[in-house]
Amino acid sequence: MPDHSHIYIGSAFVAGVVLTIAFKDLFYPEIEERIRDYRARHSSKSYQNASVDSLAVRHGPPAIVDGIEGCIGNTPLLRIKSLSEATGCEILAKAEFLNGAGQSSKDRVALSMIELAEERGLMTPHSGDTIYEGTSGSTGISLATLARAKGYLAHICMPSDQAIEKSNLLLKLGAIVDRVPPAPIVEKDNFVNRARALAQAHTNSTASESSVGTASQRGRGYFADQFENEANWRAHYNGTGPEIYAQCNGSLDAFVAGAGTGGTISGVALYLKPRIPNMTVVVADPQGSGLYNRVRYGVMFDTKEKEGTRRRRQVDTIVEGIGINRVTANFEAGRELVDDAVRVTDAQALAMARWLVEKDGIFAGSSSAVNCFAAVKTALKLGPGHRIVTMLSDSGSRHLSRFWAKAGNVGGAVDTKLEDVLNAKEDQ
């Protein structure tokens, strides 16, 4: 019986091998071809879906963009590790110095103002039209860069007490630059009023010369008017706000930013507040500015404006780009959504700028230092476990001759404590 079993098993094995070979020869080529086709089709679909999915979740622009203006927006949101560890909160900063045209948050504003003017027929590329603007520097740099890219000229008016490297850069970009003595907004020689008057004179002279057949000055003059132009806050409503919301997955407790024109704080607040009603919006205000009292007490006033004093600068601070002593349309657009304000002295801004270099390797501009100081104060007020977002508006490279000249060099062996920053005092 066992021998018969062995014979049976062996015969069955041989028969199986023969049948397998026969089946392979008869049917396998067709099956193999079908399998190859199936795999090819589904592999292609998987690759296409993966490509679409990966692009959908990327934080950043497409791999290839059209011109320098395509490099604006979609900036990273970085965690400032030292401040997060020191406060127990997550302090995040929008790296606006990575915008690709003028390397500041003003790239968004400049592009928005130009596009709105084009839509309204106020400017035409390559027609000789000139953009005029009154600015402390960053908006002018962004406008000058984009003007060249889009076929315009730029004429920038700025206070003469701003860092010289800003006007030098504007000249390298081909802009005409007027450095005018600081003056109140009510005076015609104020840098904003001068830009407005020059734009109007340009347009009027072009029209007059056209009627008599001369053309010494081509095109029209367009006054960008960043303080009152709604394209300012809309740039942040359409760009900065949605980016922050997406990068935070809709979860943040406070947004902190300085205000000069007011476009950033208003645009971001107008976008985020309806979606995150319980979040806090905080203005970071340098010394000499009246916005702190405007938010806290409803009155635009600073103690440095008391009767019998006359300040050399519009806002008595070494901080550039934020702080103001008048109401602007852009700030008023979102003022009711602003919950609080933090006053930051020059000494505190300088100490924070040095801290960011020492602890994080972040070389921040003056307004960015003010923002980060106010973010820390907000974090300490809210308590551990909260998420605060602020802005790194531009780098320190535009503040070398003034703000960073005062801040000095950061030594290699320095070990600053956060208390030193919070309690920083002016040198006597």
From Swiss-Prot:
Cofactor dependence: pyridoxal 5'-phosphate
Biological process (GO), any one: cysteine biosynthetic process from serine
GO cellular component, one term: cytoplasm
EC number: 2.5.1.47
Role, per record: Putative cysteine synthase that catalyzes the conversion of O-acetyl-L-serine (OAS) into cysteine, the last step in the cysteine biosynthesis pathway. However, in contrast to cysteine synthase cysB, this CS-like protein seems not to function in cysteine biosynthesis.
Family of this protein: Belongs to the cysteine synthase/cystathionine beta-synthase family.
Protein name: Cysteine synthase 2
Designated gene of the protein: cysF
